[in-house]
Amino acid sequence: MRPFNFNIQKKAQVILFSMLMCNHGNVFAQEKVASNVTSNDGNKKYNVLFIVADDLNCDMGCFDDPIVKTPNLDKLRQHAVRFNNSYCQYPFSGPSRASFLTGYTPDRTGVLDLKTNFRDNLPAAVTLPELYKKNGYYTARVGKVFHANVPNDIGKPGMDDPQSWIDTYNPIGIDRTEEDKVINVTPDRPVGSALCYMATDGSDDEHTDAIGANIACTMIKKNKNKPFFIAMGFYRPHSPYVAPKKYFDLYPMDQITLPEVPEDDWVNRPIYERFTDPINWGVEETKLREAKRGYYAGISFMDAQIGKLLKTLEEEGVADKTIIVFCGDNGYNLGQHGMWKKQALFEHTTRTPLIFSVPGLTNNEGKSSRVVEMLDIYPTLANLCNLKNIPQDLQGKNLLPLLQNPDAAWDGAAYSVLLRTPNRFIKYMKKGERALGRTIRTERYRYTEWNDGEKGGELYDYQVDPNENDNLYNNPKYKKIQKELQEKLYRKIEK
């Protein structure tokens, strides 16, 4: 297969958006796997509770983290399959959500920033909730499901997709109305992209996510006698890291540590991976640990709100016919490589939590190490619920075989993309410069190219280098592996 050798100007027109103009026959058609799963209640359809967290990585008890406490997600996983190697298609909220809610990669949606609406490029796309709506389901959104800027869009619809829903709710709490009280350890950055936190007095119910969870519980109660698709979009643990003080108290400062970063960590890797410039934003270690504590507090606070949802399903008698999907939108660095937040093509920024609980199917705790994509959520849910008129050009795969057997044979590789452009925080790039990173993750390796290799590349062997410290790109010993991974990457792009 010939390499992609477009120059960067052509890439802006071709690589980023070529899939928007391509013939639909050239787009990878989903492999439909017929589902023989039915709800426990005869003729009634499955309900769906779709839970999305914002900026959540896999540092959680439910993913075997020894520190971060998630008792309600721990309970959920007892009758679910958790995917330990699930990856987003873009490590940034807007592009990622547009991708998994439409079932198309960012190359196809054309969403590579926080300003573009996928409808601008795909006006006829049928989103996941919209398909449920067309199949007679009650569809509703609470909070952030499609993209919304945080904190500025809290209490507003943001970049919501109105035709996907029957009802929508935009909760707002003191995490927004009193955000002027947050402690910002990176004061040159606005709170939505800063390391900042606030431990509040008072109850959970004063906060946006608790208000939203209460609304979602009410919606479940009111619509329990009809098939529903209810999406609860939590704003936490996105910055500012705000939660009641009791959740901060779960994490004594002596438990909060930072990952070690070798002095030569950035010597042999493309500079375009670096989102945090300078390293750790020049913030002292104690302040970084305080911010990380706030992130953990936000996770435990969010988990408590999930507990309300699970309890309501049980109390209303619909738990045994409701599929629950829990996921994040992208990963999150907490000091890995001296970096914070998302917007990089590393493991911590592309790996996302994903849990599927399906009554009658995932009755026991299951854990899958197979590599899956967020794109797989759409075709999996649509087939589990036997929906009609599923788009035939979805780019994900049906996860049913892994829900039936988490260790089943699976030819999976995850594709992610990131467009790096200069801004007032990215000081190493020239005005007008663009760097397009594309990566593929297999069970053992990650292979990344920046501008088709013109601006460098990366190859990591996680079997011997789980922390991505040794870039093997163009290493003669890995020549064959690199070529195979490059071909896998290009096949993903062509689809």
Predicted regions and their residues:
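Bacterial N-terminal signal peptides
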Residues: 14-24
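Formylglycine-dependent sulfatase
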Residues: 2-4, 20, 29-451, 455-458, ...
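Short, low-complexity, intrinsically disordered N-terminal modules
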Residues: 5-8, 25
